[in-house]
């Protein structure tokens, strides 16, 4: 097992980078994971992409729900490890897993039982699109427990300064997904052509393998996981502490997804092709925010451990070091999407009537990528401090602003592009406001 990285002693930039690089690579792999799905599904046509886009919103919603356990668990474990209390860290981790298992089972049951009314929310027009969306939802969200566990394992390994298991496990999952996608979607060799359903099955199989690999790495760990006893009675005090710390981030993520679903419903008013554009565009755009989110996770653990050790000077220096890496990446993504939207979008969808909408999406959202990277990294810094309210307040307020702004802008000649502008403008504002708020916070300390 890879030795954990010492985050509370030694050179700041090198230790932060050593922790962050595997996480960022893991995020890029996850992005590739999703993009490969989109490339293969895109070959079935924009209708298939629209099906996955609608059902995928509930997978996105599930990520907000698991944040309730993941955020509180990661911060408390990191803080306990930084303070030298690995026994406490083990209790927090056990409680985190218990909460996650409960949430995963309940969410899976809801998505399976109510799959049809959940898809009906989007007012899709094609019966085949609706049926495919229901099938995709029942499989991916019905078995969401594997996705939940993988996120918790990633957070806890990162909290103790060991980001390699997540990278290795996710890499194997990507390879499996690459192999299974064409086999199950198009029916190559002895496999039946399952189309959208095949993509869902390939995703779940890959996630199950990733979970098994995480269990193997956990069995080899001597820092945290041998202190975890899942069969012990739930610790209500620690569950309450995890809940209180994770709730603001959870609410922010759930509200964000709820708003995104409302926006998707507005987009659906322009046809199923517009839904496909939003789904593909969001996947392409993830080259920026998923990478930043990976680095933010490293910043979270770095700050949590140093906060537990009482080393405030390293916290400030660590945040500045993180920005030196994340902001150039955000700028690169801005240039990429604004200057080269056409060849990028054509990788996924080649239908001539859909491409202009895709180009518009990428160019408009491209302007916000730098600020989105700034927001995500700063949010990770706040959460590492145990202060989850500022990112939540900023995120919820400005995300809510997207709906009236989208309604106002779509009433102008911008039409569908007005929705894209509402997303881009609010992302820019979130980055600027949260950055200023964090500067004020650290000056007070």
Task: Give the label of every model feature segment.
Residues 9, 13-32, 36, 58-65, ...:
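Residue-level signal for short hydrophobic patches within transmembrane helices
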Residues 70, 140-158, 166-174, 199-214, ...:
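Short runs within selected transmembrane alpha-helices of multi-pass transporters and secretion channels
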């Amino acid at each position: 097992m890879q030795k954990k990285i010492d985050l509370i002693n030694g050179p700041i930039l090198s230790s932060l980078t050593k922790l962050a690089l595997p996480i960022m690579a893991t995020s890029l792999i996850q992005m590739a994971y999703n993009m490969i799905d989109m490339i293969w599904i895109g070959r079935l046509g924009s209708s298939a992409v629209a099906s996955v886009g609608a059902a995928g919103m509930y997978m996105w919603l599930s990520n907000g729900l698991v944040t309730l356990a993941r955020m509180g668990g990661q911060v408390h474990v990191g803080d306990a490890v930084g303070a030298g209390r690995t026994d406490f860290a083990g209790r927090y981790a056990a409680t985190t897993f218990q909460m996650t298992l409960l949430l995963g089972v309940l969410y899976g049951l809801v998505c399976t039982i109510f799959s049809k009314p959940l898809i009906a929310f989007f007012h899709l027009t094609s019966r085949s699109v609706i049926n495919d969306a229901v099938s995709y939802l029942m499989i991916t969200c019905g078995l969401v427990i594997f996705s939940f566990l993988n996120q918790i394992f990633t957070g806890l390994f990162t909290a103790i300064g060991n980001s390699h298991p997540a990278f290795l496990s996710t890499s194997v999952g990507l390879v499996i997904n690459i192999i299974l996608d064409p086999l199950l979607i198009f029916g190559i060799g002895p496999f039946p052509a399952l189309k959208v359903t095949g993509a869902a099955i390939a995703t779940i199989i890959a996630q199950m393998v990733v979970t098994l690999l995480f269990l193997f790495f956990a069995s080899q760990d001597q820092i945290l996981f041998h202190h975890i006893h899942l069969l012990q009675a739930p610790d209500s005090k620690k569950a309450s502490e995890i809940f209180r710390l994770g709730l603001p981030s959870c609410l922010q993520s759930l509200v964000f997804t709820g708003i995104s679903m409302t926006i998707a419903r507005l987009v659906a008013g322009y046809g199923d092709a517009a839904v496909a554009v939003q789904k593909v565009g969001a996947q392409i755009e993830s080259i920026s925010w998923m990478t930043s989110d990976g680095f933010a996770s490293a910043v979270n653990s770095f700050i949590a451990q140093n906060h537990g050790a009482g080393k405030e000077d390293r916290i400030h220096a660590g945040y500045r070091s993180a920005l030196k890496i994340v902001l150039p990446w955000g700028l690169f993504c801005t240039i990429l999407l604004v200057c080269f939207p056409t060849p990028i979008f054509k990788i996924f969808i080649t239908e001539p009537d859909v491409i202009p909408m895709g180009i518009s999406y990428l160019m408009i959202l491209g302007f916000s990528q730098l600020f989105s990277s700034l927001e995500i990294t700063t949010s990770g810094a706040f959460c590492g401090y145990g202060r989850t309210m500022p990112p939540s307040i900023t995120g919820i307020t400005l995300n809510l602003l997207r709906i009236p702004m989208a309604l106002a802008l779509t009433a102008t000649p911008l039409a569908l592009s007005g929705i894209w502008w509402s997303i881009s403008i609010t992302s820019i504002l979130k980055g600027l406001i949260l950055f200023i708020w964090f500067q004020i916070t650290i000056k007070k300390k």
